[in-house]
Amino acid sequence: MERKVFSKDGKEIGTINLDDRVFNIEISHGSIYNAIKNELSNLRVGTSSTKTRSEVRGSSKKPWKQKGTGRARVGTKRNPVWIGGGIALGPKPRDYSYRLPKKVKKLAFKSVLSLRAADENSFKVIENFNVESGKTKDLALIIKNFASFNGKVVILLGNDDQMIKRAGKNIRDLKILSFDKLRVVDLFYAKNLIALESAVNKLNEFYIK
């Protein structure tokens, strides 16, 4: 698949090949769903905790005798039915993370890249560039040539360029990611996806293995 390449000023300067084995496969929505679920689950801290009837403070003495009072029978003030009692079936600290099979994860990345590449308006390939100043305004001027800031924007890099990442720190709803540190959830929910030439070449090599 051929795709136009733009300069950082927004002018068309050539084309680049998007490998069909990465950017033009049959989309597996199930693998995308499972990958996003996995990524979000792995982010969960899992520290929610409640006290059971055995953990709350208070006497375990029977409030009144079993029979003869006309009241409902009760065994302890720590009963979950009572105010101040324990919580029945409440959350406890747990680990929500789990591993996704490599084949499913790889298929999810290929599927979401194919999904995004199918829309030329929201997926742009631009020449490799540097932001030597590290200033936000310099990067913002480049981004405005390809995307509006009324939604999430993701920039894909071919390497870990710290100056570009530094320049983008203060831009709301912008994520700058290296090709080897992508998440399906970021690619799927981005309104605009901007990939540098080097990132496309690296993705072509990385996912056809």
Curated annotation (Swiss-Prot):
Identify a single GO molecular function assigned to this protein.
structural constituent of ribosome
Q: Which UniProt keywords apply?
A: Ribonucleoprotein, Ribosomal protein, RNA-binding, rRNA-binding
One GO cellular component term of this record is: ribonucleoprotein complex
Q: Which Gene3D superfamilies match?
A: 3.40.1370.10
GO BP annotations of the record are: translation
- State whether keyword Isomerase applies: no
Positions of the UniProt region annotated as Disordered: 46-72
Compositional bias, Basic residues, is annotated for 59-72
> Does the record's keyword annotation contain rRNA-binding?
yes
Question: Where does the secretion signal sit in this chain?
Answer: none
Any Pfam family from its record, for instance, is: Ribosomal_L4
Q: What does this protein do?
A: One of the primary rRNA binding proteins, this protein initially binds near the 5'-end of the 23S rRNA. It is important during the early stages of 50S assembly. It makes multiple contacts with different domains of the 23S rRNA in the assembled 50S subunit and ribosome.
The similarity comment for this entry is: Belongs to the universal ribosomal protein uL4 family.
Q: How does it assemble?
A: Part of the 50S ribosomal subunit.
**Can you name this protein?**
Large ribosomal subunit protein uL4
- Lineage of the organism: Bacteria, Pseudomonadati, Spirochaetota, Spirochaetia, Spirochaetales
